[in-house]
């Protein structure tokens, strides 16, 4: 069992640009102390390479099934016939079916330690909402979730399970908050940016409430490194390419940052390329601009230096709702800017075809988000020399995404 998280800030070639307040209005940086557990603020700004995992969180990790397995994709390899070896780390074995639980448990623990009785958050496809709902229940907290309206209407199974774990779930934009009312109309698909604004406003409107972000913040990426730290121990050989999908960046960071850190320190993974895979519906790393922008739609949170499509960008409704986000985490954005991380974007149809190939060769129906990594792995396997090695993170299963598969299959 991993006993510490890895912080890539200690090994970055350039100093990470700090959060910044806008030129006008009240301080957003000062707001963080009102909405986040104090330990998470410390983790957001620390330059220490290693952060100890509290025993209570480690025990929670054990209870939910960490460490998660790493498999060789022999069926997929055979179907492709390229002579490339493919490995995948599988986070779908966790109770909520995705990697999101890794940071949800940590954040809920720190919220409880700060005296909170209620937590609020945003969710797209529902993986993060489910993770927060379960983590809150395990640590004796109430949970409120603002779910993008397109997913609220289509991902009904995840909505049901959030409620089963005890959460109150609102479709976003909602009429519960001013941020929601500003965008509200019945046919609005919502966006993660709007949902973040609603969750933050909700936390500020009551007592003993804390906000739990699902991605983008550096402490979220920190917690997810349990994935990559386990994978480094499990991989029988170093990959030529490591791949993961990107919404805000926590999944990609969780899988690759321990490897990137070793590469930057000269301790291994010297030949490994790192490929971030995004949806063409939200192509921040491939078509976005590197600048300071708000991580939420209304501008409640501090500005972050990141690749962004603009905080007012509303992506179209897609099957991979968890990738419908306008920006990428600051550390990931910096790595992309420096050329250490590559990026590629795919259209939905190609991704879903790769998902079906994986289901029929490996037996796991992947989440549409995770299928982006599969699509990239398949394409890479067709281009790399025989004997090459690919490793990717399968961040979740798609058993609660039957709506997406039903629509695609017709």
Swiss-Prot record:
Pathway: Amino-acid biosynthesis; L-tryptophan biosynthesis; L-tryptophan from chorismate: step 5/5. The modification N6-(pyridoxal phosphate)lysine is found at residue 100. PROSITE patterns: TRP_SYNTHASE_BETA. One of its GO terms (molecular function) is pyridoxal phosphate binding. Keywords: Amino-acid biosynthesis, Aromatic amino acid biosynthesis, Lyase, Pyridoxal phosphate, Tryptophan biosynthesis. It catalyses: (1S,2R)-1-C-(indol-3-yl)glycerol 3-phosphate + L-serine = D-glyceraldehyde 3-phosphate + L-tryptophan + H2O. Its EC number is 4.2.1.20. CDD domains: Trp-synth_B (cd06446). GO terms for biological process: L-tryptophan biosynthetic process. InterPro entries: Trp_synth_b-like, Trp_synth_b_CS, Trp_synth_beta, Trp_synth_beta/beta-like, TrpB-like_PALP, TrpB-like_PALP_sf. HAMAP family: Trp_synth_beta (MF_00133). Belongs to the TrpB family. This is Tryptophan synthase beta chain. It comes from Pyrobaculum aerophilum (strain ATCC 51768 / DSM 7523 / JCM 9630 / CIP 104966 / NBRC 100827 / IM2).
